[in-house]
């Protein structure tokens, strides 16, 4: 049979087609925003495609150096730096401007220098998201997000919850 788990690419493509098949191209929006703390731990710049007006698909870029890492509970060795790429999909629940935002995704972490410490290894972290989102109901406008992001840390074998605030522009 064509649709079995032996063909995950086909299953994935069918799921994407179903998810976005009803998307009205004229109602799809974009957003660019700055996030402090939250999913990228320190700060990040993010691009988001708002599909079907209620499904945000996000990719971002964040950065932390050794001095900043102390503030986020993960002290790195001297001169260590890490780039973070948060990728997520979510769901907006609400009417017009005020929404509950739920989401899930992962964070790719890339350390700039090799290290012997376990918390300084390249890898992927899983994350969730719950928060409040205000966005303009016009075609363009202001965007604000207040979020809680539980992030799974495999070294600690548990979740740490980070708060975040985002400010940006919807177009």
Regions flagged by a language model, labelled:
Residues 40, 86, 148-150:
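Proline-rich low-complexity regions
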Residues 48-146:
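Gram-negative (and chloroplast) outer-membrane scaffold detector with strong preference
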Residues 31-46, 53, 62-64, 116, ...:
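Solvent-exposed loop/turn segments connecting transmembrane beta-strands
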Residues 89, 159-171:
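Outer-membrane beta-barrel "beta-signal"
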Residues 1-29:
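Cleavable N-terminal export/targeting peptides
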Residues 28-30, 147-150:
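Extracytoplasmic loops and strand-loop junctions of Gram-negative outer membrane beta-barrel proteins
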Residues 38-40, 93-97, 171:
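A generic beta-sheet turn/junction motif
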């Amino acid at each position: 049979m064509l649709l079995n788990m032996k063909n995950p690419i086909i299953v994935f493509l069918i799921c994407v087609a179903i998810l976005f098949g009803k998307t009205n191209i004229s109602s799809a929006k974009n957003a660019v925003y700055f996030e402090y703390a939250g999913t990228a731990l320190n700060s990040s710049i993010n691009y988001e495609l708002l599909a079907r007006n209620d499904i945000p698909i996000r990719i971002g870029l964040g950065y932390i150096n050794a001095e900043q890492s102390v503030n986020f509970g993960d002290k790195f060795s001297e001169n260590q730096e890490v780039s973070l790429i948060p990728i997520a999909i979510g769901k907006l629940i609400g009417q017009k401007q005020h929404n509950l935002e739920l989401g899930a995704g992962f964070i790719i972490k890339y350390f700039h220098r090799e290290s012997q410490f376990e918390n300084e290894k390249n890898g992927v972290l899983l994350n969730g998201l719950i928060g409040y989102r205000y966005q303009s109901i016009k075609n363009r406008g202001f965007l604000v997000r207040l979020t809680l992001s539980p992030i799974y840390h495999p070294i600690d074998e548990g979740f740490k919850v980070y708060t975040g605030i985002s400010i940006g522009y919807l177009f």
